[in-house]
Amino acid sequence: MLGALSVATDGGARPLVLWNRTASEPEGLYVRQAAPVRIGALVAFQVPAPAFPYADRHMSYLRRVPVLKTVAAVSGDQVCTGDDRLVINGEVRAPILKADRRGVALPRWNGCRQLREGEVFVFSDRIPNSFDSRYFGPVNLAEIVGVFRPMALSRPQPGDR
């Protein structure tokens, strides 16, 4: 099973604890913390509207659970997705895949612009096929349900946060 499982909430839709079962971030239990959304922060959010049709058909677990990803760029940063690669502030970060491992076409955010106030770009370089902002574009801060930190990882690895 893949996905982040919300196991406790604050009485609303904002989870306090998440169980991440995807390889794009270390597998394990994460707890929400009072921390700013900044580069390097792990944030949880619902699948953005541009990605929902693909996610609904091919990643149905995301209907129920938030996505957990690392913030790679914030307001003022330049993000480009041309030439089948992600470039942030002039640095090539990763390729952009045309299809998933089943051969299904992935959605794609096409753009080259400075992120606006209230936007972040999320990205994981832990696996080559992470479903992140390369495919659905910037995430609005209003869509973020929290900043999370690892509480108990299943398989800690060097470099894990």
Predicted feature residues:
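A short, sequence-level motif marking secondary-structure junctions
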Residues: A35-V37, P95-V104
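Mid-length scaffold segments of soluble, non-membrane domains
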Residues: L62-P95
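Protein maturation boundaries and topogenic segments
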Residues: M1-P66, Q114, G137-R161
